[in-house]
Amino acid sequence: MSSKEQKTPEGQAPEEIIMDRHEEIEAVEPEASAEQVDPRDEKIANLEAQLAEAQTRERDGILRVKAEMENLRRRTELDIEKAHKFALEKFINELLPVIDSLDRALEVADKANPDMSAMVEGIELTLKSMLDVVRKFGVEVIAETNVPLDPNVHQAIAMVESDDVAPGNVLGIMQKGYTLNGRTIRAAMVTVAKAKA
């Protein structure tokens, strides 16, 4: 046997061995180039990641500021609306004693006396006129009886036994209450019915 034949593995021709070794060398070369990553590429990747993070933070900040501005605008609109709606509250509170006095005058007036009829009629017209004016500005009277007690609009002064009115319902009004655009400015002082013992 010749020396060439001895070195080649069985069943392989010398050209095949050379080709196999050449493929092994090529396979090793890409690994070597992958290990030699350019440091500038790493720096570029880092900078791109930092830029993306900064853009995200900036976008979030802008959205947050826009949301805060929108909330501020809404709150301001609500405050202005409430200011317009309830600007008369102090004025109405000052008028309530006058309305109460007119109510009391009608309660104690001797309506059967013909000499007093003109005065009673004048008080009634004045009271009606006053109530019409305040109603134009959103004031409503709380003076219903035989309705369930509502702590938002009623202040219970006493409980009275009653057969006519269901327990827990308003039996009588001692002082009328008033609301301004749905907000209670003075609760009605009421007596509440209770079951007989």
From Swiss-Prot:
Extract the ranges annotated as region (Disordered): 1-40
A GO CC annotation recorded here is: cytosol
- Taken from the record, one Pfam family name reads GrpE
Gene3D superfamilies attached to this UniProt entry = 3.90.20.20, Head domain of nucleotide exchange factor GrpE
InterPro entries of this UniProt entry? Answer: GrpE, GrpE_coiled_coil, GrpE_head
Q: Name one GO biological process term.
A: protein folding
From the Swiss-Prot or TrEMBL record, what is one GO molecular function term?
protein homodimerization activity
Sorted UniProt keywords: Chaperone, Cytoplasm, Stress response
Where located?
A: Cytoplasm
The family database entries (SUPFAM superfamilies) matched by this protein are listed as: Coiled-coil domain of nucleotide exchange factor GrpE, Head domain of nucleotide exchange factor GrpE
Q: What does this protein do?
A: Participates actively in the response to hyperosmotic and heat shock by preventing the aggregation of stress-denatured proteins, in association with DnaK and GrpE. It is the nucleotide exchange factor for DnaK and may function as a thermosensor. Unfolded proteins bind initially to DnaJ; upon interaction with the DnaJ-bound protein, DnaK hydrolyzes its bound ATP, resulting in the formation of a stable complex. GrpE releases ADP from DnaK; ATP binding to DnaK triggers the release of the substrate protein, thus completing the reaction cycle.
Quaternary organization: Homodimer.
Which family does this protein fall into? Belongs to the GrpE family.
Q: Which PANTHER family match?
A: GRPE PROTEIN (PTHR21237), GRPE PROTEIN HOMOLOG, MITOCHONDRIAL (PTHR21237:SF23)
Record protein name field: Protein GrpE
Organism in which the protein naturally occurs: Shigella flexneri serotype 5b (strain 8401)
The gene is: grpE
